[in-house]
Amino acid sequence: WQPRLVLIDPELLSTLPPRFFADGLAEAIKYGCIYDAPLFERLGQERAGDFLEEMIFSCVDSKRRIVEEDERESGRRMLLNFGHTLGHAIEKYGRFEGYSHGEAVGVGMLLACAAGERNGLTQPGTCGRIRSLLEKYRLPVACDAPLSTLLQLAANDKKRMGDSIHFILLRKIGDSFTLPLSLNQLPSFFGCDKSVSYTHLRAHETVL
């Protein structure tokens, strides 16, 4: 069913604790990363609270445009999952208590972007720009989960298709794409190949 109306009440957000206000901003940062480079720039140059209504409208409008193009999530709509495959794994690792959804997605975005840069698919420096924006809004940029464990958890993600997972990566800020990876490709793509003792590799080491 499609919504007939989207209600936006920024005043309600003022009742949230700072941690959970920032949690929601992680999704706004995501939209800037995958679709709306001007929003990403504005989040860096201004305070989100100073243009809250415009920011929310921009995010809702971006989602509307993407969903209208791909209602069944068979193509372009997958872009909305940027950061979520590893983000869901981080949430599971923390037993849904250690990290909020936005915190986990933020780290997931960094891990995906770092892998994209490592493999020559993402413009160098993109990961650093995302990290700086997450830090500005006091969102974590690391987690204590071994990367190998996160990849194992990601292998059971609900978005898995057969023996592959569609990861969302960035060419640059505002320009995203889908990359299907087989489960066997994950360790090498994320830097956990046989030359690395990845049982001790932790997520934060891949985003420095």
Regions inferred by a protein language model and the residue ranges of each:
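Single conserved hydrophobic/aromatic residue that forms the stacking wall/gate
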Residues: 200-208
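Phosphate/ribose-recognition catalytic cores of enzymes acting on nucleotide-derived substrates
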Residues: 137-182
